[in-house]
């Protein structure tokens, strides 16, 4: 029997799958049939089933056509969850950017002079006012900000950093590697657990361009430890006529609840110290879109803008509009338009109400409402727990975790129980979450 002759014709398969666009279907048919021919040649395929071939091609096509990025319900309790997209954008703020994205806008056009303008002028104006800096610049993320600053001011020169701040954050982003790639010469001072201001001063040479301080994202050093304060570093930098730069990583504006402000000061306190340059992420505690926000002296920001590398880190009108709208919300103290802040500021009483609502909609669920702890996330406030409320589900924790994940609900296992943390569950997601739970319970009853 000639298996090659049993392979269905391309046009026959196309007729069976007319609901799939040809631009997707045709190459998948060709690839699948080529795999079958190869399988026949090497003896791995000994029979042909036309129906199975069509189903395989249909499945592969649907995988291409199905959206890869989908909405999930974040029930982990982590507000700034990097793997789940970090900060949410308020619908009103999104509409602000949408209007400027679906129409032409004055992105790089000076309406007064009638000629080409500066795309960074928009953000510099509002961010400088918000943060109290001389100027500001936005790039596509904080890693880009770090690279741009080092490349502009410390290329082929020395940048002094504490050994305790040579961190690695998510995605294998290592400060020493970024410094090397930027052309800056890393000078390590102090030890992992202790670095004094004298260590910085002793390391300064005629080749020193910068004293750099790095936020220790995702970890903290406690016990027998000490570090030079930002104020000390700024004072020393001014004294020695070199730059000071703080890679803050994340920044917030209003004072945070649960004593979080005691561990890290708000950006307003940092800017009062008059630093040369500061940078942080736009999608962490600031609560906006992914971006690297650079604040500092106007002459330094102007030099950054002249670096040709900035072109590679340039942000578009959507990012600029979202940052601008978020900044406006802060200026007007409309904190309810910052979902990240809303999540962090929720009281345990409010979280309990959400948990009660969920249980009222899931009468068949065996669960308890319990108090627990969670973290802000996104490398901010490492090891600083905040109170939360969870719905602790009885039963096989691993099975519940898998079943919920199949329905795009991401929770966590705590004390060998699957829990849904109400701090990160949105109010308008409660009913949908209840429907998912009820459908899982119904399936379990049918399978029993």
From Swiss-Prot:
NCBIfam families cross-referenced by the UniProt entry: selA (TIGR00474)
Species annotation: Nautilia profundicola (strain ATCC BAA-1463 / DSM 18972 / AmH)
Biological pathway: Aminoacyl-tRNA biosynthesis; selenocysteinyl-tRNA(Sec) biosynthesis; selenocysteinyl-tRNA(Sec) from L-seryl-tRNA(Sec) (bacterial route): step 1/1
Pfam families the UniProt entry points to: SelA (PF03841)
Cited InterPro entries: PyrdxlP-dep_Trfase, PyrdxlP-dep_Trfase_major, SelA-like, SelA_trans
Catalyses which reaction(s): L-seryl-tRNA(Sec) + selenophosphate + H(+) = L-selenocysteinyl-tRNA(Sec) + phosphate
Protein name, UniProt field: L-seryl-tRNA(Sec) selenium transferase
EC code: 2.9.1.1
Cofactor: pyridoxal 5'-phosphate
Family stated for the protein in its record: Belongs to the SelA family.
Biological function: Converts seryl-tRNA(Sec) to selenocysteinyl-tRNA(Sec) required for selenoprotein biosynthesis.
Localization of this protein: Cytoplasm
UniProt gene name: selA
One GO BP annotation of this record: selenocysteine incorporation
Any Gene Ontology CC annotation: cytoplasm
């Amino acid at each position: 029997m000639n298996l090659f002759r049993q392979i269905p014709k391309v046009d026959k398969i196309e007729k069976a799958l007319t609901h799939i666009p040809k631009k997707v279907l045709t190459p998948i048919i060709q690839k699948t049939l080529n795999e079958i021919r190869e399988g026949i040649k090497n003896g791995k395929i000994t029979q042909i089933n036309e129906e199975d071939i069509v189903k395989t091609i249909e499945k592969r096509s649907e995988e291409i056509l199905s959206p890869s990025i989908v909405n999930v319900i974040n029930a982990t309790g982590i507000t700034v969850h990097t793997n789940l997209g970090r900060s949410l954008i308020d619908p009103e703020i999104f509409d602000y950017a949408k209007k400027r994205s679906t129409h032409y806008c004055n992105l790089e056009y000076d309406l007064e002079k009638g000629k080409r303008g500066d795309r960074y002028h928009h953000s510099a104006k509002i961010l400088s006012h918000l943060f109290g800096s001389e100027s500001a610049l936005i790039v596509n993320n904080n890693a880009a900000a770090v690279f741009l600053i080092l490349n502009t001011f410390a290329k082929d020169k020395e940048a002094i950093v504490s050994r305790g701040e040579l961190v690695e954050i998510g995605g294998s982003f290592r400060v020493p590697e970024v410094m090397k790639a930027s052309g800056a010469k890393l000078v390590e001072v102090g030890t992992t657990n202790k670095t004094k201001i004298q260590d910085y001063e002793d390391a300064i040479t005629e080749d020193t361009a910068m004293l750099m301080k790095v936020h220790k994202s995702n970890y903290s050093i406690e016990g027998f430890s000490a570090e030079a304060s930002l104020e000390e570093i700024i004072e020393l930098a001014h004294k020695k006529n070199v730059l000071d730069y703080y890679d803050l990583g994340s920044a917030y504006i209003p004072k945070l609840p649960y004593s979080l402000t005691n561990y890290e000061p708000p950006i307003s306190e940092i800017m009062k110290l008059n630093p040369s340059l500061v940078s942080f992420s736009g999608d962490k505690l600031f609560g906006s879109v992914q971006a690297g926000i650079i604040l500092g002296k106007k002459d330094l920001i102007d030099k950054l803008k002249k670096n040709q590398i900035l072109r590679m880190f340039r942000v578009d009108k959507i990012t600029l509009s979202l940052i601008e709208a978020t900044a406006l919300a802060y200026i007007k103290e409309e904190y309810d338009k910052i979902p990240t802040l809303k999540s962090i500021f929720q009281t345990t009483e409010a979280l309990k109400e959400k948990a009660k609502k969920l249980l009222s909609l899931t009468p068949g669920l065996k669960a308890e409402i319990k108090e627990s702890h969670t973290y802000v996330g996104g490398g901010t406030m490492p090891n600083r727990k905040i109170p939360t409320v969870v719905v602790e589900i009885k039963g096989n924790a691993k099975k519940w975790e898998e079943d919920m994940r199949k329905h795009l609900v991401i929770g966590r296992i705590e004390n060998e129980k699957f829990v849904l943390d109400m701090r990160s569950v949105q109010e308008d997601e409660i009913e949908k979450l209840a429907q998912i739970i009820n459908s899982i319970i119904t399936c379990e009853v049918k399978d029993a």
